[in-house]
Amino acid sequence: MVLFSEDHIQETRRRGRIEVICGSMFSGKTEELIRRMKRAKFARQRVEIFKPAIDTRYSEGDVVSHDSNSISSTPIDSSASILLFTSEIDVVGIDEAQFFDSGLIDVCNQLANNGVRVIIAGLDMDFKGIPFGPMPALCAIADEVSKVHAICVKCGQLASFSHRTVKNDKQVLLGETAQYEPLCRECYQRALQEDREKS
C-alpha cells in the first residue's frame, strides 16, 4: 500500500492565462475582479492591480465597485506602463479595460506568455451597444471569458445593455448610478426608440 505518492503532488510552476470578466454596468464585473484578486492574495500570490488614471469616480488610487468594495490599485495612463510594474508579479488585475488603448492586447499576451495570470474586467459594449475599445479582442485571446449580467431595471430580466439616462453623446462618460441603467435587449431597444423620439 502506498501512503504517499509524488505523482499526486500538485505542480506549482506558474502558468499564464488571460481571464476576462465582461458585461453591462452594474453587473458585478469589478466585484468579481476584486474577489479573484483577494483570493490570489490570500494564497500568498504576488498581485498588482491597474486601472485607467481617468477613472477617479470613487477613489484615485483604489479599484472600487458600485457596492463600495475596494482593493488598492495603481492608476496608469497607458497600457504599456503595466509592464513597468510586473517583473515579480504572479497575478495582474486590470479594471475598466475598455478605457485602455489597443496596446493592452499585446501587454496581456506578453504577460500570460511569461507565466502571469491576467484578470481583466470591463464593459463589452458602450451605451450605443457597440463593442467597446480593446474588449472584443481581449475576449478573443482570453483563455476564459465570464459574461456577467445585471438585472433590467424595467422588467427584471437579465440585462446585457447599459442605457445612458443623460443626454450626452461622448463615448466615454464615467458613470455612476444616476447616469446609466442596466436593461435587457427588449427594454434597451424601447429606450433607444424613446430617446430618438425626444431628440
Curated annotation (Swiss-Prot):
Q: Where in the cell is it found?
A: Cytoplasm
Please list the residues that make up the active site: 96 (proton acceptor)
Q: Which Gene Ontology terms of cellular component type are present? A: cytosol
The EC number(s) this enzyme carries: 2.7.1.21
Binding-site positions, ATP = 23-30, 95-98
- The enzyme class is transferase
Q: Which InterPro entries match?
A: P-loop_NTPase, Thymidine_kinase
Residues that, per the record, bind Zn(2+): 152, 155, 184, 187
Q: Give the primary localization class.
A: cytoplasm
Query: Which GO BP terms apply?
Result: DNA biosynthetic process; thymidine metabolic process
Q: Provide this UniProt record's keywords sorted from A to Z.
A: ATP-binding, Cytoplasm, DNA synthesis, Kinase, Metal-binding, Nucleotide-binding, Transferase, Zinc
Give the source's domain of life in one word. Bacteria
A Pfam cross-reference name: TK
Q: Which GO terms describe its molecular function?
A: ATP binding; thymidine kinase activity; zinc ion binding
Q: Could you tell me which Gene3D superfamilies the record lists for this protein?
A: 3.30.60.20, P-loop containing nucleotide triphosphate hydrolases
Annotated family: Belongs to the thymidine kinase family.
HAMAP family reported in the protein's UniProt record? Thymidine_kinase
Known partners and oligomeric status: Homotetramer.
Would you tell me the protein name for this molecule? Thymidine kinase
Q: What is the lineage of its organism?
A: Bacteria, Pseudomonadati, Bacteroidota, Bacteroidia, Bacteroidales
